[in-house]
């Protein structure tokens, strides 16, 4: 990474900055601390990309700043916080693709192209051939979890993938055994496990993670690492005074302050280790001033405010379409039925509130009711998540959208 933060590298992902190199789809409504990106996006996009090839480094430059991105050499370690349904499906998928058992369907980096020059030039190389990204063969997985099950056992328990596929990958998946997790049931009420770290305070737990990360990197001979939070949704939290500065944040860790959640401890450990951090849950995590300052100080990129793979993804597709046609919205009702561990966690009102806040804010952010009050002011937006064990991991989602068009005539969309 460059020695000083570069806007394109250190900024969290935003819907206002096209970024073809993102590996993971994430929620498109950033928290308030990220929203200044909109004001700065034009400035960021001034930086042209020069001297780029599969084997050479990026050079991003303007008159004042130059930043280098080294080519992807050596192994890339992907450290996953949580080894449940999401992580094991991700790991098994990569292992299956590496062995020619499956195709990388849904992967932007592996299947999508990037246009060079004019459309008529017909220059559309695959992103993976144009950008110096790590090859799938160079990816190594590690994880933390509150349960000691290997990736194979966890995948079998989750029941997302077919047993026949998992049987073909069993040797690789059995090798991935989770390290003891940083966990506190106060933040995830419906779960408890035995594979948990102990420490006198939260700073000591962070120091254990930092040492563990360094040892894991050495043992697996990785050139670089990235950390992804793929664990359960924590209880709803607001920004606290201890989050304002790095000094107050670190003191709060030593004091075992309740405003420091486990996800923040992981993010802190990653950033102190110079490791990029992606948040795949709607938790208040890296998006606090103290951790954003640490990321900037160490020139480490961060991103994420929940994975975007289901109902919220559909909203971010449909809502811009309604807005583009200047169609009004009376209301949007969404419900989910799921019976997996995620559903069990979200059955707790405090964890559900974290998810609900994230899901509710996405429409307001896209539709801008303050700009178009006659179309979007005071629309009703209801989100329900129902835990129903017989459904298992086969989540079901329903949406009813009440819109109005020419002369105010009402219409309905059902998904």
Residue ranges and their predicted role:
Residues 58-281, 285-297, 311-319, 412-415:
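Metallocofactor- and cofactor-centric catalytic cores in central/energy metabolism, strongly enriched
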Residues 11, 22, 42-43, 57:
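Ala/Thr-enriched low-complexity intrinsically disordered regions
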Residues 277-281, 302-306, 330:
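Short catalytic-loop micro-motif centered on adjacent basic/acidic residues
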Residues 77, 81, 293, 300, ...:
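Active-site-lining helix/loop region of Rossmann-like oxidoreductase modules
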Residues 23-40, 44-51:
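Short, positively charged and aromatic/hydrophobic N-terminal segments
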Residues 6, 17, 37-38:
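Short linear segments in intrinsically disordered or otherwise low-structure-confidence regions
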